[in-house]
Swiss-Prot record:
It comes from the Viruses. SMART domains: LIGANc (SM00532). It catalyses: NAD(+) + (deoxyribonucleotide)n-3'-hydroxyl + 5'-phospho-(deoxyribonucleotide)m = (deoxyribonucleotide)n+m + AMP + beta-nicotinamide D-nucleotide. GO terms for biological process: DNA repair; DNA replication. This is Putative DNA ligase 205R. The lineage of its organism: Viruses, Varidnaviria, Bamfordvirae, Nucleocytoviricota, Megaviricetes.
Amino acid sequence: MDETQQLLYKFKNLTISENEKLKLKEKADHFYFNTEKEILTDNEYDILAEQLQSTNVGCSPLISKTDLPLWMGSLDKVYNDKELNLWIKKVASDKYIIQCKLDGVSCLIINKDNKLKAYTRGNGKVGTDISHLIKYFIKDKCLPNNIALRCEIIIKKETFNQKYKHAFSNPRSFVSGVVNRKQENIVISELNDLCLIAYELINFPVNEYQKNILTQIEIIEQLNFIQFVNFKTISNEFLTQKALSNLFKEMKNNSLFEMDGLVILANTPYIRVTEGNPKHSIAFKVRGDNVKEAKVTFIEWNVGKTGVFTPKVHIVPTEINGTTVSCFTGFNANYLIEKGIGEGAIILVTRAGDAIPQIIGVKQTGVLTFPKDYEWKGDCRIVEKIESKERIIKQILHFVESVDIPYIKEATINKLYNNGCTSIELFLKLTQKDLLLFGPKLSSTIYNSIQKSFEAPIEKFLSGYNAFGDYIGEKKILLLLQKYPNLFELENLDAIDLVSIEGIGSKTATQIKQHFINAKLIYNNIIQNKLFKGVLHTPSKQNTVELFKVCVSGTRDPLFIQELKNRGFVLSDNITKKVKVLIVKNSNEETTKVKKANSVGITILTLEDFKQKYF
């Protein structure tokens, strides 16, 4: 099995770690937004997102990356009456609009200052410029000035089944493939089979109140060139799980397009959010139909690298849709307390997407028992009071995976722990003699792998030590070091300054600030004990050089690329107006990037010339 298959197997068998969940989400986002293939169903993705608790839906596209002119958020999801009622209390309205949640490619069409542009959603902040496709969707019609439309690019089910079903797994994968295709590979007949369906009209300035949804619909209908998504108007007494589930089935059966839920919107004016998900609208999703009752036999508590306990709910083996299921994720301690899940509880269970075991309700509460020697961390999690063997092994394993040390698995670390290797520091100081318990040949291989890890980038080391806490890995640490080359010489960090770094949001900034003192201690320990021999992010010449975005063509020398990152230069995969210098291996070679750089006046330097000027 390749890495993706291994992650999927672990996810579906509830043996996946938090770090692996992040990797799986990144891969799922990549496949969903950039390819014609999906590795998780919508239900499976929703469950993964719930397990991670905090997630950014979407993935930066691989072609024609560009900053989006407007924030294109996703939607919070609700599944039951309790969640619906909580939302209704926050967003009161006389009328609610129920739209089909179409399963296509989300896009934005915008006419600002009489310039018509189109973009796919990407990750909400960075998307793909698809302005060259506008003429295929709205023909000769023009959107009024200072107006934007959020739309779905989609294909009719009938058209897909007649013409493309043999080659694509589902309609959405076909649409994604057509939209993300390079201009020179466009097939006009395929584009002509796509439909553009509007679901939000945005007026400028965007920081002022937007019109209510019914008014938006009237305006869009007057434009007379674009179809609005199918909708119904209801009052709040009909906003129940049962009524919406029936409505979903009805609308899905009658829909010309694939849909994967309902969108509920309060019919009131609203301010568009500039980050996160909108408050005036939510998505209603229907869980799988194969729901069974099951009795809980016991709760298994597993400790992770940070000492946090993750519960696994074991049940009397129960068959769901032909597969016997015996355990489910319990998310966290507070989840079990709130739901009343413990030994003897009768729970309602299903397999989301016919794959992932999922608890969807509780019919009868049970008795919850906790592990020994725990304490509360925050509002929902419990942690170990004393560091256990299991926790230390997972810490070392996380380090091994972060710095890419081959040949070392959990069983290897378990054996080392039993022979006195009880910390990352001791692991890094292992001699070949210490490793002889694995035999002369394997001991030499493991020793050499550990020694090579000393040369890994410092951001990998800090990620391996979990210096800034869970979910802050090498990518975000690298952003920090690029912004602050002397990071660990600073007394403290300002959360507002951190948020100004592209790629770091307010929650991440707060976590970095909270962990900064501990991260400094870890960093100083690494340096003082000579556990690191790689390149530090020293300020050297970059303090006197104005940093900028560069593009590299004709060479992917890993040492040079790493040095660019270390010095704080931002790498672009393509020539854009924000690129200042194109770095080439050979000045005489006229590539596509060289031609484009010349056409827009971007400076072109050879690798050696760039080093001489900026390093």
